[in-house]
């Protein structure tokens, strides 16, 4: 029996002390984790509870069919984050406009961007799906967040990560000081450190691409994919194609095993 289990709460508190944080970022992550636990529970019942499956008959801003669980997860993450006083504005793949914090709640110093349920069209066929999130410091002085706060480049991210809902539910995140993964232990309802200090192998053997888009690729992209398939590449043998159609699942595999997305 392992008595050295490190919970996410302990890990984030250790990190907070190490870098002198105030706890605001920790509070945001805690709420993301709460929402993820609820989503994980709903996904686990997707084949049993009929009103979870299927689409709602409209498309999102990306032109994708909106699934019922998309709508549920989107509202869940918004409601988990909008009242805690640590966030000034949010943006979601499921929303056309910025998500403002209600007037009755205090505004914080962080901006949260998320895709509540990536790969949701895979729900009906029991394929891995996930949540993607990124967190920025606001750049405006205070009050309601603005479009300027939202449209920051990726290099300005304060922290980012994803949750994959699969045979197990795993959270992977980084603040620029290493990458750590936590698995949800259903027996206690807590995320525990399962993948400490993740490093991607220097050389993998997998590439992940939707080759149905081949006719629309630029010539350089086509040539690169053909290079990976050939024996002329640095592996001296063809790469293996693995494409699930859920970014979180494809990226997670390639992060752990090595590969190209």
Predicted regions and their residues:
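IMPase-like, lithium-sensitive Mg2+-dependent phosphomonoesterase catalytic core
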Residues: 1-48, 58-59, 71-261
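Short beta-strand-loop/turn "lid" adjacent to the catalytic site in phosphate-handling enzymes
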Residues: 53-68
């Amino acid at each position: 029996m392992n008595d050295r289990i490190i919970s996410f709460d302990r890990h984030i508190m250790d990190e907070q002390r190490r870098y002198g944080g105030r706890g605001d970022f920790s509070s945001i992550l805690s709420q993301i984790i709460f929402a993820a636990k609820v989503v994980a529970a709903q996904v686990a019942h997707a084949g049993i509870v009929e009103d979870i499956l299927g689409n709602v008959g409209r498309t999102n801003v990306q032109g994708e069919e909106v699934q019922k669980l998309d709508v549920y997860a989107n509202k869940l993450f918004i409601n988990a984050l909008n009242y805690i006083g640590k966030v000034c504005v949010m943006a979601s793949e499921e929303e056309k406009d910025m998500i403002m914090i209600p007037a009755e709640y205090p505004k914080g110093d962080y901006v949260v961007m998320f895709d509540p349920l990536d790969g949701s069209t895979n729900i009906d066929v029991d394929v891995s799906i996930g949540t993607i999130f990124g967190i920025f410091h606001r750049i405006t002085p205070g009050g309601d967040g603005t479009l300027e706060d939202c449209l920051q480049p990726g290099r300005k991210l304060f922290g980012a990560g994803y949750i994959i809902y699969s045979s197990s539910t795993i959270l992977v995140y980084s603040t620029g000081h290493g990458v750590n993964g936590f698995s949800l232990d259903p027996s206690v309802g807590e995320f525990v450190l399962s993948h400490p200090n993740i490093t991607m192998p220097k050389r993998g053997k997998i590439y992940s691409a939707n080759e149905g888009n081949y006719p629309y690729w630029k010539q350089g992209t086509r040539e690169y994919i053909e290079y990976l398939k050939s024996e002329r590449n640095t592996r001296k043998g063809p790469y293996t194609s693995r494409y699930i159609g859920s970014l979180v699942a494809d990226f997670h595999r390639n992060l752990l095993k090595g590969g190209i997305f």
